C-alpha cells in the first residue's frame, strides 16, 4: 500500500537465509505490495558485493565469506551491528537510485545527531563517517524498480574483523561505532530512532511494526 511501511524486526539471523528471503520478497512483490524495512543483527560474516575483489580479503580466518549481489565491495557483519534492509518500490515513491542513497545516508546522519554524534557522507565513498572513520556501510541492489539490501550501522560490536579486510575496498579504512562515541550500546535504543528518521525522509504516513521470533 502506498504511503505505508512495515518494519520487521528479525532479531539475530544468519546472512544467507536473510539474503534468500530478500530475493523472494522482491521477486514476488507486485505494484500493490507494501514497502518494508527489515531490521536484523547478523552472525559474523564477510560479504562480498558485486564489485568485490579477492585482494581486499586479507585474512578472513574462520569467518565465512559469502558472495552477495549488493553494490560495493567487502564488508563485515556481526553482533552489535544494526543492519536495515530497505525493500521499497522506487517508482511508486518517485525516487531515483541516487535519491535513495542520499535519503539513507541522511537517515543515518540524522539518527546519529539525535545521540549527539556529528557525521557526514562522502561523495567518493558511500556510507557515513565520523572524523573520517566509517560508522555505517551502504550497499543496494535494484530489481524491477524495487530496492533491496541496505545499510549496516556499527553500534557496539567487535570491530577487529574489519582489520582482516580492506573495508569497502579501501586499504586502511578505520572503523568506529556508536558506543565509542558516547552513544547507546543497545540496538533497541537506536532502531526506533533510525526508523523514525527514515519514515520522515520518505514521507510514509502509516507504520506497522512486526517482531519475528528467531
From Swiss-Prot:
Task: Identify the domain of life.
Answer: Bacteria
Biological process terms from the Gene Ontology for this record are: protein modification process
Task: Could you list this entry's UniProt keywords, alphabetically sorted.
Answer: Acyltransferase, Cytoplasm, Transferase
| Location, primary (coarse class) | cytoplasm
Q: Do you know which Gene3D superfamilies this protein is assigned to?
A: Bira Bifunctional Protein, Domain 2 (3.30.930.10)
MF terms (GO), sorted A to Z: lipoyl(octanoyl) transferase activity
Q: What residues form the catalytic site here?
A: 168 (acyl-thioester intermediate)
Name this polypeptide is given: Octanoyltransferase
Organism listed in the record: Photobacterium profundum (strain SS9)
Report the gene name.
lipB
Amino acid at each position: 500500500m502506498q504511503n505505508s511501511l512495515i518494519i520487521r524486526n528479525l532479531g539475530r539471523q544468519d546472512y544467507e537465509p536473510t539474503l534468500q528471503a530478500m530475493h523472494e520478497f522482491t521477486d514476488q512483490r507486485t505494484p500493490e505490495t507494501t514497502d518494508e524495512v527489515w531490521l536484523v543483527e547478523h552472525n559474523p560474516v564477510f560479504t562480498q558485493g558485486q564489485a568485490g575483489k579477492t585482494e581486499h580479503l586479507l585474512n578472513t580466518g574462520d569467518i565465512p565469506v559469502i558472495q552477495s549481489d549488493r553494490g560495493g565491495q567487502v564488508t563485515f557483519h556481526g553482533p552489535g551491528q544494526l543492519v536495515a534492509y530497505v525493500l521499497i518500490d522506487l517508482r511508486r515513491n518517485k525516487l531515483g537510485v541516487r535519491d535513495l542513497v542520499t535519503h539513507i545516508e541522511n537517515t543515518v546522519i540524522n539518527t546519529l545527531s539525535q545521540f549527539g554524534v556529528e557525521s557526514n557522507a562522502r561523495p567518493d565513498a558511500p556510507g557515513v563517517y565520523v572524523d573520517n572513520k566509517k560508522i555505517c556501510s551502504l550497499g543496494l541492489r535494484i530489481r524491477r524498480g524495487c530496492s533491496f539490501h541496505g545499510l549496516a550501522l556499527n553500534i557496539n560490536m567487535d570491530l577487529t574483523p574489519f582489520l582482516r579486510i580492506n573495508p569497502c575496498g579501501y586499504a586502511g579504512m578505520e572503523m568506529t561505532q556508536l558506543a565509542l562515541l558516547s552513544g547507546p550500546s543497545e540496538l533497541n535504543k537506536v532502531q526506533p530512532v533510525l526508523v523514525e528518521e527514515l519514515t520522515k525522509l520518505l514521507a510514509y504516513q502509516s507504520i506497522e511494526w512486526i517482531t519475528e521470533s528467531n
